[in-house]
């Protein structure tokens, strides 16, 4: 029953919960889109926020967003801004760890500037220069 399985109060009672969730894209501040591509719904929200919150409240828990750094067509999934119309499933305030094939970014408690640097550091190397340039607009 999803009312029990996805219950944050139940999840947090278990120590060392590791919640691994996927993302369609993530912006350089840590906002996660996991249900849409722009304004086109791709999937349901599911229990992503339940498990992110439950793991973060679990003693020794680790909430993780894991994604490939690029789409199959080589487009970066780490972006300066989410696509117009994209839904924010997990807010930047709830994101702790983001993992790509290029490393791990621990965003918990970090400033926007620190988050930008950390997320660009785990982006595909071919996109890092462009992300550095585009991310200046985030801070403008």
Placement of each model-derived feature along the sequence:
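Conserved phosphate- and dinucleotide-binding cores of soluble alpha/beta proteins
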Residues: 1-140
């Amino acid at each position: 029953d999803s009312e029990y399985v996805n219950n944050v109060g139940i999840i947090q009672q278990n120590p060392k919960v590791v919640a691994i969730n996927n993302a369609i894209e993530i912006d350089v501040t840590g906002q996660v889109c996991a249900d849409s591509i722009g304004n086109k719904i791709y999937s349901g929200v599911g229990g992503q926020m339940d498990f992110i919150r439950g793991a973060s409240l679990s003693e020794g828990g680790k909430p993780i967003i894991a994604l490939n750094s690029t789409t199959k067509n080589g487009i970066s999934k780490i972006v300066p801004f989410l696509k117009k119309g994209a839904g924010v499933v997990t807010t930047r305030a709830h994101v702790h760890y983001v993992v790509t094939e290029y490393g791990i970014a621990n965003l918990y408690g970090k400033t926007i500037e620190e988050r930008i640097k950390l997320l660009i550091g785990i982006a595909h190397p071919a996109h890092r220069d462009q992300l550095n340039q585009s991310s200046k607009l985030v801070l403008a």
